[in-house]
Amino acid sequence: MSISSVIKSLQDIMRKDAGVDGDAQRLGQLSWLLFLKIFDTQEEELELEQDDYQFPIPQRYLWRSWAANSEGITGDALLEFVNDDLFPTLKNLTAPIDKNPRGFVVKQAFSDAYNYMKNGTLLRQVINKLNEIDFSSSQERHLFGDIYEQILRDLQSAGNAGEFYTPRAVTRFMVNRIDPKLGESIMDPACGTGGFLACAFDHVKDNYVKTTEDHKTLQQQIYGVEKKQLPHLLCTTNMLLHGIEVPVQIRHDNTLNKPLSSWDEQVDVIVTNPPFGGTEEDGIEKNFPAEMQTRETADLFLQLIIEVLADKGRAAVVLPDGTLFGEGVKTKIKKLLTEECNLHTIVRLPNGVFNPYTGIKTNILFFTKGQPTKEVWFYEHPYPDGVKNYSKTKPMKFEEFQAEIDWWGNEADDFASREENNQAWKVGIDDIIARNFNLDIKNPYQGETISHDPDELLAQYQTQQAEIGELRNQLRDILGAALAGNKGAN
């Protein structure tokens, strides 16, 4: 049976269980099961490699001990074991990060995990179906990596916190252009399910890893932080799938939840798509300088990225149009960005890249810390011939970025080979300052075209609605700050 049909069968079985309500809970259920199965596959490999190997969790909780035998415990006995023994034990493991890092990973993964299934017989069917996938086979593991990404894409129900699955084509292009090297620290401060980190890991492995020592070095390079439990568990599983034995650097935390000035870390590479359109809970903004405080998540993350990048550190960040044209605190952040970093390229993405999750129009900002910006190159990414909008069934493809890759040039010579064309143009920093750091600069080589195509009109309408929502959030922030100021004055 193919892996994709195994996944479909899993979903069909879980739909029969009264305790599992909707795609998000199905994904949550599948996540902790997958985590334990993949974790135990790695345990078996580590046992073979090390003579006196010590298990990081009690042996009876390893997948092989209670789940691997298709004729093993089932029904109420299985439910009782999972709910009253397995979960309480793993949530309360004594596993210091320095002495038992793999145990620490398990404890973190299970900190807020939950068994939704109420029928032990159906749970046994799910477990037996999972056992049809052989994670010790590199071919099946690679295949499953692709399927895993598909699961994340299919099951994601985008909420109102602005978290959207980043299309693989966009992720690959960003990592390809940033080109992380062996030994460079690579971070995603809002890592979600780990798409950027997995892509960066694969990029370094495919281009720079030659020896076993290189592979060990690579395992230490990857850093991620995710504040929500389910994406954190999915990301940790994703890292295990990619061969990171001890993904302790994937933290279950809110990156913004400590004063900006207290960050000691200096990171070589940041690739991320921070949540946008959402706002942080009260008090988080107090971790930022008084004149730069806002509750808008994307603005706070951009400040954080500028702060934690090392000298000559490189970043690629997805940001909405609202960041480009926004005023107030957004203007101050863009001024800081151009003073502290060389914002050398902005790739303007077309409508629909994040369909069906949001119609907000987005951009990729590429910058390097240490030198101020002299000029910004813009590249307007066009739809391919015959495409009027992207959709879930017709997503963006990596090959579409070949034109940008061919045009890109080399940062070492200040991109001397770049030339303006119908899609690319540059704007000097003096012009940007004169525009009060409004970076929403239209392509001078493309005239305004009026379209009567219903698909395009619908896409434009969705974009406008999303931008109205973004402006509403900004206005709420400004009014909130003004009211808070008045209270302080009284």
Swiss-Prot record:
ATP-binding found in the keyword field: no
Source taxon at top rank: Bacteria
Catalytic activity of the protein: a 2'-deoxyadenosine in DNA + S-adenosyl-L-methionine = an N(6)-methyl-2'-deoxyadenosine in DNA + S-adenosyl-L-homocysteine + H(+)
UniProt keyword terms in alphabetical order: DNA-binding, Methyltransferase, Restriction system, S-adenosyl-L-methionine, Transferase
Coiled-coil zones: none
GO molecular function: DNA binding; N-methyltransferase activity; site-specific DNA-methyltransferase (adenine-specific) activity
A Pfam family: HsdM_N
PROSITE patterns reported in the protein's UniProt record: N6_MTASE
First-tier enzyme category under EC: transferase
One BP annotation, GO: DNA restriction-modification system
Subunit organization: The type I restriction/modification system is composed of three polypeptides R, M and S; the restriction enzyme has stoichiometry R(2)M(2)S(1) while the methyltransferase is M(2)S(1).
Chain's role: The subtype gamma methyltransferase (M) subunit of a type I restriction enzyme. The M and S subunits together form a methyltransferase (MTase) that methylates two adenine residues of the sequence 5'-GAGN(7)ATGC-3'. In the presence of the R subunit the complex can also act as an endonuclease, binding to the same target sequence but cutting the DNA some distance from this site. Whether the DNA is cut or modified depends on the methylation state of the target sequence. When the target site is unmodified, the DNA is cut.
Family classification: Belongs to the N(4)/N(6)-methyltransferase family.
PANTHER family: SLR6095 PROTEIN, TYPE I RESTRICTION ENZYME ECOKI METHYLASE SUBUNIT
Protein known as: Type I restriction enzyme EcoEI methylase subunit
Organism of this sequence: Escherichia coli
Gene: hsdM
